[in-house]
Amino acid sequence: MSLPSPLIPVAELAMQNAQQSGYLEHWPQALITQFQFISGLSKFVVETVQRDAQLAESLPEMLAQESRQEAYRTRLAEQLQACHDEVAGHRVLRQFRNREMVYIAWKDFTQAWSLEESLSHLSELAEAMIFETYQWQYQLCCKEWGTPTNAQGEAQPMLIIGMGKLGGGELNFSSDIDLIFTYPENGETQGARRSIANAQFFTRLGQRLIKALDQQTFDGFCYRVDMRLRPFGESGPLVMSYAALEDYYQEQGRDWERYAMIKARVMGREMYPEYQELRQMLRPFVFRRYIDFSAIQSLRRMKSMISSEVRRRGLSNNIKLGAGGIREIEFIAQVFQLIRGGREPALRQRGLLVTLEAIKQLQLLEEAQVCHLVEAYKYLRRLENLLQAMADKQTQTLPDNELEQLALAVAMGYSQWQALQNDVQQHMAKVHAVFVTLIGDEEDEVSPVERHFNELWDMAHNPEVIEQILQNDLACQNAATMSEQIIQFKADLAKKTLGPRGREVLNRLMPKLFSAIFADADAQFGLPRVLHLLHNIATRTTYLELLDEHPAALTQLVRLCTASPMISEQLARYPILLDELIDPQQLYNPIALDAYRTELRDFLARIPEDDVEQQMDALRQFKQICSLRIAAADIAGVLPVMKVSDHLTYLAEAIVEAVVHQAWQQVAEKYGEPTHLKDREGKGFAVVGYGKVGGWELGYNSDLDVVFLHDCPVNVYTDGKKEIDGRQFYLRLAQRIIHIFSTRTASGILYEVDTRLRPSGASGLLVCPVDAFEEYQHNDAWTWEHQALVRARMIYGDEHLASEFHRVRHQVLAKPREQAKLQKEVADMRAKMRDHLGGKKSDRFMLKQDQGGITDIEFLAQYLVLNYSAEKPKLTRWCDNVRIFETLIAQGVMEEAQAMLLTQAYTTMRDEIHRRNLLNLDADVALDKFVALRQGVSKAWQEWLESSTI
């Protein structure tokens, strides 16, 4: 064994330090020669021996042994038993690990062992350290909290499942260890002053075990412990019972978890009778009874993901993850295990080399191909171990430093780096050729853009990767926030029971969704809204399939959610509406104004009239469907704001009619009908709409302000089996109407209904006789109630009642009034409202309540109607502000320029409120917005109500 000249100075320095320490005096010459050789190659060996005098003294004796793995557990157990606290135990563990790793590295660098011997020692050492640390900590925890037991009082162990290379007995030199913790049965501890649940006991035990192995101390650490392969990953419980574990893998187990579980092995399994139960439980999840060709596509996607990560991180010369590297050999073996392992017991091996032998025996690959794979695997794994043993670092990337390159080449038996590099390339080329033949390369089938969206979903556990894709590949401004949203969404989904079918659909759907979302410049708004909706429907696979199978529906979903949080929330709350997205032509084409009543009757006709609950749900669904179509047309610019309000108002009127009809049937079935209706048409009942519904100005979230009227005389009774007073009948009818509107079903409420504008307000009769209504309006109503009457119209009722209401309204509005008194009362009421509702945000203009806003315009219109209708009776005709101003012009009351300014201000501010409603924003704007319009409104107010102070 000799070193090339560039490495000699490094070795000489190490030898000088060793001689000064004096420990070489007791070493045989052959060992000193080996140490000099290794000193030029491994910083780890030199530094560990130099730091540990006991190791330096005992190393000759250790190296004289051909194998030490059989005694690992007994020797470590003895040392841990002598430890009475964690600090001492942690020191023992780290010293034990470092000493044995020096022994293994020495054997590797001197080529005393085969690869199999080296991997076996590394794996046995890790298992011994994990298991004996567990045994030590279990005893300490039992002393502190009692022994965990099941319902029969039997002590319960924690089983530690080693995953990946640890489970397969193929651990590399500086590897992480992937673990899953489980225990057989729930129960509680016994033998301590206070019992705790088994789950709590094992969680604390697991935390201590991880700390004992993973924590960095003065003596270093033992292993980096990775628990992310457990059910639900980092968001899941640290430890799960068998039952919970089984439920998870049956209901939610994903393809990559199947691959990971192939190599799963319980640490110290011969100690546990419970091991067989766990093994039998997991086998059906890993190995399917049928031949499962879906594994190929899944592995191909995983490989594509890894290749993307290699590119992104700039991992050139990576012998594990690069093309033809160790991971591709593992994937080749796993393909056959997953496809045929359910039928071929020989393929259920954990070790890769024995699996490749089984593949050869079963003639699943050509013998020459298997030979290439075996040779490459042994070569690359030995190279990986030596690379890591040089400095005890977890790396699979070949060095770019010339001295390190030479050291690695010498360790592998070469005199030059180039020769090693040539052999590495040849081995990896042969592996990749087999891989492409067998599995193919998804990257050839997928465009770079599509790959980004696949990776966004596949890598949604890695913030760094996701943020890089969003920022570099998709040019997103808010990459950090959006990355967090995607990662949190996937973590939350991991806790849901999706089932294999649901998860498969979701995995197909998500890249398509990302593609649609990030095609929009406002993706930062669309992303959280769409993810929120998907979170709500994730367990309902039919909805996921609808979006997956109908690209048009998916496109419309993203478009609408991006444009409006109101729509996204509605879809999230009532996913039945997703059906409406399938046909864009229908979606953006609302029902004709005069067809709402007919469409609603047809919609309800499919439901039995006596099924009250279904009828109520159907009303709500009809409203939601129509509102969605109106909003979609609104967002698309098909409908101007005035037309949007028309549609929402006509929809509300159709629903009011249907609700009255349903309520009438339900009340009449019980009591019969009032007898005064026998010789006439209709129901003798009316619904008067006030405010927005009265003025044809409904918004998406508007309440219905209504007053109920009837014309039933006194001393009239119903004709049913259970006779009641006629006026009592109408009271029950109104109560039933409000119930149908307000009851919260699975589809929500229909409308919020406000009846406080009735005579005498909340203390008055819920249903008012029309003659009492007339008397109240003439004799008892306040001026503000007459203002409200300006915007009142009958939205449901008999012709007789309609003409009566119109007569009363006209007479009341056209009453002669004293102008100064009217001015004062209107202005005073406005001032009260402004004090109560306006100016809540000093840095914002409240569109409705602040000075110069919508309410000022409405009050102006109402004042002018009340003041001038006595001499200009045509002013009472309309209930909406726009047509009131048109009539004021026509009747010569107001100059056209002023009326047009007020109309423009009114419609502009309404438009802004409406737009902000779609965005779920408050009805306020910056102080510098609409300044000219607001000043014009204030000037008009001063002109018409000049005797009042505002």
Curated annotation (Swiss-Prot):
GO biological process, one term: regulation of glutamine family amino acid metabolic process
Catalysed reaction equations from the record: [glutamine synthetase]-O(4)-(5'-adenylyl)-L-tyrosine + phosphate = [glutamine synthetase]-L-tyrosine + ADP; [glutamine synthetase]-L-tyrosine + ATP = [glutamine synthetase]-O(4)-(5'-adenylyl)-L-tyrosine + diphosphate
InterPro entries in the record: GlnE (IPR023057), GlnE_rpt_dom (IPR005190), NT_sf (IPR043519), PII_UdlTrfase/GS_AdlTrfase (IPR013546)
Region described as Adenylyl removase: 1-443
Pfam families with a match to the protein in the record: GlnD_UR_UTase (PF08335), GlnE (PF03710)
Keywords on record: ATP-binding, Magnesium, Multifunctional enzyme, Nucleotide-binding, Nucleotidyltransferase, Transferase
Disulfide-bond pairs as recorded: none
UniProt-listed Enzyme Commission number(s): 2.7.7.89, 2.7.7.42
NCBIfam families xref list: PRK11072.1
Function: Involved in the regulation of glutamine synthetase GlnA, a key enzyme in the process to assimilate ammonia. When cellular nitrogen levels are high, the C-terminal adenylyl transferase (AT) inactivates GlnA by covalent transfer of an adenylyl group from ATP to specific tyrosine residue of GlnA, thus reducing its activity. Conversely, when nitrogen levels are low, the N-terminal adenylyl removase (AR) activates GlnA by removing the adenylyl group by phosphorolysis, increasing its activity.
The protein's name in its UniProt record: Bifunctional glutamine synthetase adenylyltransferase/adenylyl-removing enzyme
Organism in which the protein naturally occurs: Vibrio vulnificus (strain CMCP6)
Underlying gene: glnE
